[in-house]
Regions:
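A short, structured surface patch at a secondary-structure boundary
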Residues: 2-55, 61
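Proline-aspartate-enriched helix->loop->beta-strand connector
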Residues: 43, 51-64, 80, 180-192
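Extracytoplasmic substrate-binding proteins
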Residues: 71-147, 165-172, 177, 186
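Short beta-strand elements of ligand-binding domains
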Residues: 15-16, 63-65, 83-89
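Short hydrophobic beta-strand segments
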Residues: 14, 62, 136-141, 191
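Short helix-loop-beta junction
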Residues: 155-167
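Short helix-initiation/N-cap motifs at beta->coil->alpha
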Residues: 38-51, 88, 171-180
Length: 192
């Protein structure tokens, strides 16, 4: 999100390993080649933070999701400012984009990105208005530990916006570990 709002990779000193992995397989590798050297070893895939490594990066601010209050508290104790962005709906993400626009002194770019989000959402809603009544059941697996995108995840929104039904929609929270038996009971049509 910082890159999208700022239009540059120059202010990014660290990113989550999953963001780094996505970067490796995306057009951002061409658009922002310097991100290849950005540190991602200060946090693991489960968002467990090595605070000593964060301090070595000397960030001006750390952007975290709102479900990480203990991380914000520890960063504050270390004198490192943290900004929490609410994770969940597209509106939450858009509010986070707006906040980053203020922090990065790029409010116009933030509003343009939000406008793009809203236009994209409207496009998919219109396209899916006449979708088939039997929506495919889609299961989004995060990792080999059978962690699924639940009803509070952005992935839930993406699945429904594109005409699917989240097979794990009845799970609590954003990400939930489940059993193979649960997956078999859900009988998803598509697994991502």
């Amino acid at each position: 999100i910082v890159y999208a709002v700022d239009g540059s990779d120059k202010k990014i000193v660290g990113i989550h390993p999953s963001a780094k992995k996505s970067y490796e397989a995306s057009i951002f590798k061409t658009l922002a080649p310097d991100l290849e050297n950005v540190n991602s070893s200060f946090v693991d895939n489960n968002f467990n933070v090595n605070f000593e490594e964060v301090a070595k990066l000397k960030p001006d601010v750390v952007i975290i999701w709102d479900y990480q209050p203990e991380v914000a508290k520890k960063l504050k104790e270390l004198g490192i400012p943290a900004v929490s962005i609410k994770y969940g709906t597209l509106e939450d993400i858009q509010n986070g984009i707006r906040l980053l626009g203020k922090i990065l002194d790029k409010p116009e770019q933030a509003e343009a990105l939000i406008s793009y989000h809203k236009d994209s959402e409207a496009y998919f809603k219109q396209k899916n208005a006449s979708a088939l009544p039997n929506k495919p059941k889609v299961l989004y697996l995060q990792n080999k530990n059978l962690t699924v995108a639940g009803n509070n995840s952005v992935n839930q929104l993406m699945i429904t916006m594109t005409g699917g039904e989240n097979a794990a929609k009845d799970t609590k929270g954003s990400w939930t570990k489940v059993s193979m038996e649960e997956i078999m009971t859900w009988d998803p049509d598509i697994i991502i």
